[in-house]
Swiss-Prot record:
Disulfide bonds: none
Chain spans, region Disordered: 88-108
Lineage, highest ranks first: Bacteria, Pseudomonadati, Pseudomonadota, Gammaproteobacteria, Pseudomonadales
InterPro entries tied to this protein: Hydgase_assmbl_chp_CS, Hydrogenase_HupF/HypC
Entry's Gene Ontology molecular function annotations: carbon dioxide binding; iron ion binding
Domain of life: Bacteria
Pfam family, one: HupF_HypC
Protein name: Hydrogenase expression/formation protein HupN
NCBIfam families xrefs: hypC_hupF
Organism of this sequence: Azotobacter chroococcum mcd 1
Entry similarity comment: Belongs to the HupF/HypC family.
GO biological process, one term: protein maturation
């Protein structure tokens, strides 16, 4: 299983960016993506940026990684706050919703 880590760009240079989180900063290869700007979020795997992220998606991934650490540490109480969006019904993307038959008036 591959796990990408969201890191925020602190400084840019040609083909690389200094990126960090709350623990460390390190230089990341950015040649696989459009050149980032300071403040951007990147999904990083094996020292290379694989995609640019918006701040909300970066936070979701960070929460999921924190949840994994909490489970490993046996702290199950921490999970509720880390997966706050799991109490909602999943939504199909619009192109799949269009393929569903119309709902009956009395159906949920």
């Amino acid at each position: 299983m591959c796990i990408g880590i969201p890191l925020q760009v602190l400084e840019c240079a040609p083909g690389r960016a200094l990126c960090g989180d709350d623990r460390e900063a390190r230089w990341i290869d950015t040649r696989l993506i459009e050149p980032p700007a300071p403040g951007d979020w990147l999904l990083v795997f094996l020292g290379a940026a694989r995609e640019a992220l918006d701040a909300e998606r970066a936070a979701q991934i960070r929460d999921a990684l924190c949840a994994l650490q909490a489970v490993q540490a046996g702290d199950l109480a921490a999970l509720d706050g880390l997966f706050a969006d799991l109490d909602r019904e999943p939504q199909l993307p619009p192109h799949l919703q269009a393929q569903l038959p119309p709902k009956e008036p009395n159906s949920p």
